[in-house]
Amino acid sequence: MKVRPSVKPICEKCKVIKRKGRVMVICENPKHKQKQG
């Protein structure tokens, strides 16, 4: 899980979602997981 000021999809399978008011990226590739901090 990467914590970044700006999250963006890395590949086609990355999805940008909102959880508890936080923007997150979920993907099949665990390296692509990000959340906004």
Swiss-Prot record:
GO molecular function, one term: structural constituent of ribosome
Keyword Ribosomal protein: yes
Domain of life, source organism: Bacteria
Entries under Pfam families matching the protein: Ribosomal_L36
InterPro entries in the record: Ribosomal_bL36, Ribosomal_bL36_sp
Record PANTHER family: 50S RIBOSOMAL PROTEIN L36, CHLOROPLASTIC (PTHR42888), LARGE RIBOSOMAL SUBUNIT PROTEIN BL36C (PTHR42888:SF1)
Family per record: Belongs to the bacterial ribosomal protein bL36 family.
HAMAP family documented for this protein: Ribosomal_bL36 (MF_00251)
Name the record gives this protein: Large ribosomal subunit protein bL36
Lineage of origin: Bacteria, Bacillati, Bacillota, Clostridia, Thermoanaerobacterales
